[in-house]
Amino acid sequence: MRLAFWLYEGTALHGLSRVTNSMKNVHTVYHAPQGDDYITATYTMLERTPEFPALSISVVRGQDLARGVSRLPGTLQQVEEHYHPEVIVVAPSCSTALLQEDLSQLSMHSGVDTGKILVHDVNPFRVQEHESAEGLFTGLVKRYALEQSTTEKPSVNLLGFTSLGFHLRSDLISLRRILKTLGVEVNVVAPWGAGIEDLRNLPAGWVNVVPYHEMGPGAAHHLREKFGMPSLQGIPMGVNPTLDWIRDLLELLNVIAAEKGLPSIEMPPLTDFSLDGLSAPSGVPWFARTADMESFSGKRAFVFGDATHTVGMVKFLKDELGMQIIGAGTYLEQHADWIRDQLEGYLPVPLMVTDKFQEVAKKIEDEMPELVCGTQMERHSCRKLDVPCMVISTPTHIENHLIGYYPILGFDGADILADRVYTSCKLGLEKHLIDFFGDAGLEYEEEEPESISNGHAAAAGSEGGVPDSGEAGDAGDTDGMPWSPDAEKMLRKVPFFVRKKVRKNTENFARENGEATITAEVFKRAKEALGG
């Protein structure tokens, strides 16, 4: 029944397609019913690249099952003839996994070179998107990486960048800029844009850089165990974490440089990392000290997402913007322990671990923070509650797959994050000013009701009768106490993004003090008692 609702993670099929669709000359064949070709549409809608997804469906039909035949061998032949890929990844869907067919045996009857075929026979009922993607990428690295001498100049591999990643291409540009400033070459980026030859050349790099905890650690572990390659797995999200990341990278590179008898790589002036080469690499340190941003020190924030962006965002909000973290959570249970370890001392309450968006929405409604950093699901939930929300993690909508340069990592990413936090919290004030001065010729508020309202009268526009979204979220609450017109007028002067919370607290105060109706006097007393 949960498939009728939003899910945070996609299927195993979606996960492995994120890897194969990232790579060159790699084609994926799904042994699946016709409906599972939705994945192709997902990439054409969201990825915003000129290439068509290298995905094909070996359609399973009831007729074929009755006859005891399979279309898989024929599909593999067609893919080989039309696309000539270096590797064909074959995988079952949830439906075809129930058939328990031997896909390896079926593939052998296709006539295609078996060395080109990789059967990724993952259990789609036990494995979801991230684990499937990580497993396939690690398997490809194990299969193709070859022993070879390292590059003459300092170089790194950037691992974990995949199709449909969160602001992936911008993050890649941001890290490339930093590496170029340091004089460090990029040996291979994988899986994004990599071919099989690139995977073979991975051991030529000096260090493996893995900025995402969900994708790449398995491959880096294998390269370390088999080829002795060191890896850097910090998250350069924010100004100070980026500086720490650069120092850690230089330390790893200089150890290898010393072994090769090469000079050490020195830390360049910070201005070299800026876009103009003259100013500070990020405006966050001074921006956080402005009067406008210092008001954020009292604001409460809740963060929910994948492992990487939850950890990075909590530290950014707390350490660099001075916001109060009231809680954090993730939908990736397998990474929960790592998140707890990374955020030790940051969270006042235990980490929330759930893949049910309703539980996250309830948490937000109970706490009513001034800012939520979450996924597309939290954006929808917060819209109903009039709580400011910024998306910092997958799953996302199309507005988070942008053509422009919007990194999350590095110095440039720190500026983007600060801007997003500021605008998410501040843009709602425009609507609040219309609420506040609505009777000053703006014709935003309707005339005050003559009789006592039920506590949920919504303001309407002068023409369309559109309810004020600040009150719309309360319209379905049948347990509200009656409010007098004067009290309603005072309530509308409260900013819309905390209005629901103020209404709830005031009604609780009135009940505790035996008041039957909330008047202006009761509202004032509640405000004084609750510290407002």
From Swiss-Prot:
Catalytic activity annotation: chlorophyllide a + oxidized 2[4Fe-4S]-[ferredoxin] + 2 ADP + 2 phosphate = protochlorophyllide a + reduced 2[4Fe-4S]-[ferredoxin] + 2 ATP + 2 H2O
Essential cofactor(s): [4Fe-4S] cluster
Alphabetical list of InterPro entries matching this protein: ChlB/BchB/BchZ (IPR050152), LI-POR_suB-like_C (IPR013580), Nase/OxRdtase_comp1 (IPR000510), P-CP_red_C (IPR042298), Protochl_reductB (IPR005969), Protochlorophyllide_Rdtase (IPR016209)
Catalytic residues in the record: D292 (proton donor)
Residues annotated to bind substrate: G428, L429
E.C. number(s) listed in UniProt: 1.3.7.7
Keyword GTP-binding: no
Alphabetized UniProt keyword annotations: 4Fe-4S, ATP-binding, Bacteriochlorophyll biosynthesis, Chlorophyll biosynthesis, Iron, Iron-sulfur, Metal-binding, Nucleotide-binding, Oxidoreductase, Photosynthesis
Molecular function, one GO term: 4 iron, 4 sulfur cluster binding
First-tier enzyme category under EC: oxidoreductase
Binding site for [4Fe-4S] cluster: D36
Keyword Cell wall biogenesis/degradation: no
Annotated spans, Disordered: 445-486
Single biological process term from Gene Ontology: light-independent bacteriochlorophyll biosynthetic process
HAMAP family: ChlB_BchB (MF_00353)
Self-association state and partner proteins as the record states: Protochlorophyllide reductase is composed of three subunits; BchL, BchN and BchB. Forms a heterotetramer of two BchB and two BchN subunits.
Functional note: Component of the dark-operative protochlorophyllide reductase (DPOR) that uses Mg-ATP and reduced ferredoxin to reduce ring D of protochlorophyllide (Pchlide) to form chlorophyllide a (Chlide). This reaction is light-independent. The NB-protein (BchN-BchB) is the catalytic component of the complex.
Family: Belongs to the ChlB/BchB/BchZ family.
Protein name: Light-independent protochlorophyllide reductase subunit B
Taxonomic lineage from the root: Bacteria, Pseudomonadati, Chlorobiota, Chlorobiia, Chlorobiales
Gene expressing this chain: bchB
